[in-house]
């Protein structure tokens, strides 16, 4: 299963206009990547962070507010918090991991307080720590990364991982999008914190979230988990990229002629919206919010209202068109499989955090975004950074004896005669994963039909020529990553012949108790899927 699909080439001394050495390379500069960098540096590691955009402003968290799974250790609060989500996620979460995340989130929030994050206070003066304002949060995290001594490479997407002769990950190569220059980072360990894959659906902050890290990890043999839990659709205005759905709990949904749609809702009833959208437009109005709630909404998530104000629409009194945008594994739970508490993947030297990693461990097959994902990002980032630091310092001590190989495949080391059109590939993938009738409501024959086209498209890509320029390489790798992601998720969805969490099968509409297991997947030319047991709670 770890067999590579492309020939690996020796890294030469001429590779890379800029060359870096460090103990730990963190790929991705969102909350998970920032926490990983800070944590690794605190362990005494030399840290390099490479971000596809500008660390602190790119990604799903930076432009918006998010809830946070911040629960007091007092009384039964945490037990109740865990129990409230177990059934929703299909009973695939594990108590030990939920306990760890709840505690690490509590500890890291105390750090945020010490660092000066401005949590608001309630009427009694107690700080409310159950939400974070993305812009303020990520400005602070960028500042902390720099103060930790880590070096940041902005606008510098990674293209491929480096491995030694034993298959241990030891760095990456990439490009600077502004200068076009290539870079090489030789490190003792790598943390993948590149986020999930939203398939360029134009959801807010998701334009950089194309599954690049998962592709690079799969090229070195890493396994993924829970990729069937990848059909999360964000609810939002048809004219806006904002998919923050909390406020729609106060909405009524209507047809074009003003008739309320029975059963339609945000938390429960989103399937009714998806079903209706297949045949006609759907409109919403936040007409169930009273004056006090309306005032709170304006202060809680001000960016929610920007597009309405520009359009001259009052969302509390006027009907506006809504849509469901695919957010894939960003708001889903699938991602890289983790094999122990340090957040190491199935490949030595490679760690994963945030939405790049599976969140089944705390959410099972459903998250809803926000709260749990935010807690997972700051916790898994903290652990992955510490784990990578411990591994990386030891590995760097032996680095001079290593043979270093480039692991990238499609658009980098493929040997065809002509390049492929990245935009054409993106459109082809979107045509298979966007439609509600294929992805929201899944069915075996439709999944097989999509996979036949997606597999054929992969065969075309793997026999193409390498990208000619740095810009083309970035776009080509994004397209390849989205294609690979779609194949892992549909292969996994085909094997899970039940409805569990966010995964829905038309012909298997009920939960099957015999399928209470996770599904690991991987591979590129040949995608594989296998069962993986959920760890049971051990009685004290």
Where are these regions (language model features)?
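Extreme N-terminal leader/targeting segments of oxidoreductases
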Residues: 1-24, 42
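Core beta-strand elements of the Rossmann-like FAD/NAD(P) dinucleotide-binding domain
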Residues: 19-22, 179-189, 346-347
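N-terminal Rossmann-like FAD-binding beta1-loop-alpha1 element of flavoenzymes
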Residues: 24-49
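Glycine-rich FAD pyrophosphate-binding loop
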Residues: 42-63
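Glycine-rich active-site loop/strand segments that organize a redox cofactor
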Residues: 69-101
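Mobile, glycine/GP-rich and aromatic-enriched active-site lid/loop segments adjacent to catalytic centers
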Residues: 106, 113-159, 228-368, 435-540
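Glycine-rich loop(s) and the adjacent beta-strand/alpha-helix scaffold that form part
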Residues: 189-241, 364-387
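Long, amphipathic alpha-helical stalk/connector segments used for oligomerization, subunit docking
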Residues: 391-472
